[in-house]
Amino acid sequence: DISHFQNFRVTLLEYLTENGMNGAQKASWNKAFDAFEKYIIMGLSSLERVDPITGLSGLEKNAILDTWGKVRGNLQEVGKATFGKLFAAHPEYQQMFRFFQGVQLAFLVQSPKFAAHTQRVVSALDQTLLALNRPSDQFVYMIKELGLDHINRGTDRSFVEYLKESLGDSVDEFTVQSFGEVIVNFLNEGLRQA
């Protein structure tokens, strides 16, 4: 919001005037502030611009990456918590995995095979999210590939819902909407293309 900068500008110029700034100096300051304001507006415009391929604005990309950055240092725990909640809510999904079939969830979440699988999945998601700031076609390709990889397993979008739940307080409503608008859409597109 440019109004914060504009209020700062007025306040600083008043202070400088009270402390001896002359008319020529004030004109120079105003010229400098005009240039700063122009670049701030350009930067804000680029954050609001929507990428035609992903459908995400720069603000939405930043919201997703900020949230992910809060949990990125503990990806294994994010994966284990997400899959644990997913399997608790949808036991039939657990049965899709040969190594997980017939294992009680309480034991499964302590299993090295479970930890390895969740680490692979969340690492793939991590790489995909980091591609948000790369060329959009690469991001779209990665998301569609994730969707295609899971169609044969009968996977749906439930994983994303439980991922949001696992991220907890680090996810605000804006970020949830940003995830929902693009990630789920591209995963579903990948699933449809299979």
Curated annotation (Swiss-Prot):
Complexes and interactors: Artemia hemoglobin is a dimer of two similar sized subunits. Each subunit represents a globin chain which exists in two forms (alpha and beta), thus making possible three different phenotypes (HB1, alpha(2), HB2, alpha/beta, HB3, beta(2)). The globin chain is a polymer of eight heme-binding covalently linked domains.
PANTHER family (UniProt xref): GLOBIN-LIKE PROTEIN
Family statement drawn from the similarity comment of this UniProt entry: Belongs to the globin family.
SUPFAM superfamilies: Globin-like
Binding site for heme b: 150
Domain of life of the native organism: Eukaryota
InterPro entries on file: Globin (IPR000971), Globin-like_sf (IPR009050), Globin/Proto (IPR012292), Mb-like_M (IPR044399)
Disulphide bonds in the chain: none
Taxonomic lineage of the native organism: Eukaryota, Metazoa, Ecdysozoa, Arthropoda, Crustacea
Name of the protein in its database record: Extracellular globin-E1
Keywords associated with the record: Heme, Iron, Metal-binding, Oxygen transport, Transport
Domain called Globin: residue spans: 1-45, 55-194
GO MF assignments: heme binding; metal ion binding; oxygen binding; oxygen carrier activity
